[in-house]
Amino acid sequence: MAVFRSGLLVLTTPLASLAPRLASILTSAARLVNHTLYVHLQPGMSLEGPAQPQSSPVQATFEVLDFITHLYAGADVHRHLDVRILLTNIRTKSTFLPPLPTSVQNLAHPPEVVLTDFQTLDGSQYNPVKQQLVRYATSCYSCCPRLASVLLYSDYGIGEVPVEPLDVPLPSTIRPASPVAGSPKQPVRGYYRGAVGGTFDRLHNAHKVLLSVACILAQEQLVVGVADKDLLKSKLLPELLQPYTERVEHLSEFLVDIKPSLTFDVIPLLDPYGPAGSDPSLEFLVVSEETYRGGMAINRFRLENDLEELALYQIQLLKDLRHTENEEDKVSSSSFRQRMLGNLLRPPYERPELPTCLYVIGLTGISGSGKSSIAQRLKGLGAFVIDSDHLGHRAYAPGGPAYQPVVEAFGTDILHKDGIINRKVLGSRVFGNKKQLKILTDIMWPIIAKLAREEMDRAVAEGKRVCVIDAAVLLEAGWQNLVHEVWTAVIPETEAVRRIVERDGLSEAAAQSRLQSQMSGQQLVEQSHVVLSTLWEPHITQRQVEKAWALLQKRIPKTHQALD
């Protein structure tokens, strides 16, 4: 059957009966849709009979909220799918509810196919039912012309995937601080204005649960705080975080898709309290298990400032059924960023001027990042490694190409008695002096680049197809012109300082000063094709490097494999 880029799944079975079938329905839908899957809940609706079915309100109960949570949890095993549960017809217990929309709702990705769990008695793709389904879908949402329709049956499944059924006792996935949630059928209260906050990096299904609950509770406006600047410093692999504007763009599209009747105020979150700590018009705050204490702190802060407490709604974390050894066991952006390590982040450079049978990697990183250990791991996998520090030593040596120009520029007092350049004395001359440093680098960098080209020729002569240039100043020196890809090793600055102090015997202040004189990890990553990290145990670093190497072999053009 054809695969569609976007689809709409209309669920008509009562939620309690739907639970045992949820996994197979999602699996079937994932076979037919390869990008965006919208989900519309209309329990109890029939697609048989002459009357055209109409969208009707669904009471927001704790059972509905739990179902939304478990649907997103079940969808997490289908990582190619961007699932979005539409909330326009899900209504809280409130006296100020706006009427259901009378016009169709526009969607960011108009569905190309409409799917349903509704089943005919004979288990066929009965045309009148499919026609009713298409009419219903197009009366509610903007869909593509010539909308296809499919009734999902068990024979569409490709095997069950783990998902918690709803017909077994489970703790509520959302619980207000007061009152405590009662039965699953208990209606959920609505509020005028509320808030939710987070980093929202690479919007995932746990984010979607948090945001969906907040959207259901809010009837007029939702304030969404998006962490930025200082609040990002403690994040794992912050260099791989999406830029603030990109996170806001994806977040805003999702919010408008699922509940366009709300007014969304998406703002940067620059401190732990944000507007939730000071806005008197806010009534509720949605938090996760991890941020519940932060919500309590916000309420204490509000009381200290003569503001009413917010109603806190706590969401359970979603379990990540596919997490690996060094990843969190919950669905998290941190794990997503870890999985990016070793992947190609942007297209390689085209370098027709380089040897056609050699593919060149430029490996860089801040001091203490472990890039040289990564270079040795790549060497063990078959790469030819060029150490730019070693080339610098060769260039400085008496008779080397940089020796005479450096002595002429800085004087003979930088020499040892035996005529060798005293690099410590030379370093003291240029450190902190931009003019003197530029004089030195203008001499050294072109010479090292020339020596690197000679080493690349040697790699070709030895029959190597991959060459790695290990260089801390790769980008500052402009040596990216010598490579097809830039690979960067990243490490938290605190860990880099610890390693420098331990390795080089420097004080913490001296180590920090060294790092401040270099390009930051963030600046390096912005120009990198592949990112690696030595933050974890050595065998995890090895696994990363092997992954990066294996992916590299798949994308190296055949011309670079000619000597194999």
From Swiss-Prot:
Residues annotated as region Phosphopantetheine adenylyltransferase?
Answer: 180-358
Chain positions found as Phosphoserine: 178, 183
The broad enzyme category this protein falls into is transferase
- Localisation per UniProt entry: Cytoplasm; Mitochondrion matrix
Which reaction is recorded as catalysed by this protein?
Answer: (R)-4'-phosphopantetheine + ATP + H(+) = 3'-dephospho-CoA + diphosphate; 3'-dephospho-CoA + ATP = ADP + CoA + H(+)
Q: In which tissues is it expressed?
A: Expressed in all tissues examined including brain, heart, skeletal muscle, colon, thymus, spleen, kidney, liver, small intestine, placenta, lung and peripheral blood leukocyte. Lowest expression in peripheral blood leukocytes and highest in kidney and liver. Isoform 2 is expressed mainly in the brain.
Pathway of action: Cofactor biosynthesis; coenzyme A biosynthesis; CoA from (R)-pantothenate: step 4/5; Cofactor biosynthesis; coenzyme A biosynthesis; CoA from (R)-pantothenate: step 5/5
Q: Tell me which InterPro entries the record gives.
A: Cyt_trans-like, Depp_CoAkinase, P-loop_NTPase, Rossmann-like_a/b/a_fold
Which stretches are transmembrane? none
* Keyword annotations of the record: ATP-binding, Coenzyme A biosynthesis, Cytoplasm, Disease variant, Kinase, Mitochondrion, Multifunctional enzyme, Neurodegeneration, Nucleotide-binding, Nucleotidyltransferase, Phosphoprotein, Transferase
Q: Which GO terms describe its molecular function?
A: ATP binding; dephospho-CoA kinase activity; pantetheine-phosphate adenylyltransferase activity
Enzyme Commission code(s) on record: 2.7.7.3, 2.7.1.24
Instruction: Name a single GO cellular component.
Output: extracellular exosome
Q: Which family does it belong to?
A: In the central section; belongs to the eukaryotic CoaD family.
Q: What does this protein do?
A: Bifunctional enzyme that catalyzes the fourth and fifth sequential steps of CoA biosynthetic pathway. The fourth reaction is catalyzed by the phosphopantetheine adenylyltransferase, coded by the coaD domain; the fifth reaction is catalyzed by the dephospho-CoA kinase, coded by the coaE domain. May act as a point of CoA biosynthesis regulation.
How it assembles, according to the record, is: Monomer.
This chain belongs to the protein called Bifunctional coenzyme A synthase
